[in-house]
Amino acid sequence: MAGHSKFANIKHRKAAQDSKRGKIFTKLIREIIVATKDGGPEAENNPRLRAAVDKALSNNMTRDTINRAVKRGAGGDGEADLETVIYEGYGPAGTAVMVECMTDNRNRTVSGVRNAFSKSGGNLGTDGSVNYLFDKKGVISYAAGLDEDVMMEAALESGAEDIETNDDGSIDVYTTPSDFGAVKDALDAAGFDSVNAEVTLVPSTKADLDLETAPKLLRLIDALEDLDDVQEVYHNGEITDEIAEQL
């Protein structure tokens, strides 16, 4: 399926966030610890842990660091007592925003999230206000130049839902969360090395942004991601390459 990658629009800012790598690693380690506590230390039997490990590897985390995080979770590390909370809201141009947090104090967390929305021209919504606009999926991304037919055969035979070839030739493979590990393993075995792999929220509809609204959304995302309790920020804002180049 040809088209402009929904996933690329969600993640288009990641390359500019190297300065935040320490904070990103902290959040990845936290997810591994909690996933281990909730589902056990064996990634093959724990889809959440498998997804967390693959995401950590995509962000160049070492196996030693990952293994230490798993051991902390299996040993009852205090961070494993955190709970996952998702807040929903609206950004500029009616963009839908989902904020995934891990917290031991909901009052502190919601206060920070609400403040970030209000300072950036958005609004914190109620439960269910925008989550229907997102689907939870595994997304495995590949650079351009690969044999799409061979990849499609391997992906679909292993349970992939869809394959999307983007305008730049890169490829995104979509899976259900439960099939994510099996599809990733099959594509690895077929010789395809991914550039990113994670279970994420993919928007089913998009909100087009212009030169006025795109910077406002980016400021909102930055404000949210700077909060220690925030793990991930998802949105359905669509920023074209032409707009992105002018930001």
From Swiss-Prot:
Belongs to the TACO1 family. One of its GO terms (biological process) is regulation of DNA-templated transcription. It comes from the Bacteria. The keyword Protein biosynthesis does not apply. InterPro entries: Integrase-like_N, TACO1_YebC-like_2nd/3rd_dom, TACO1_YebC_N, Transcrip_reg_TACO1-like, Transcrip_reg_TACO1-like_dom3, YebC-like. It is found in: Cytoplasm. Pfam families: TACO1_YebC_N (PF20772), Transcrip_reg (PF01709). This is Probable transcriptional regulatory protein PBPRA1113. It comes from Photobacterium profundum (strain SS9). Keywords: Cytoplasm, DNA-binding, Transcription, Transcription regulation. HAMAP family: Transcrip_reg_TACO1. GO terms for cellular component: cytosol. The keyword Protease does not apply. Its main location: cytoplasm. GO terms for molecular function: DNA binding.
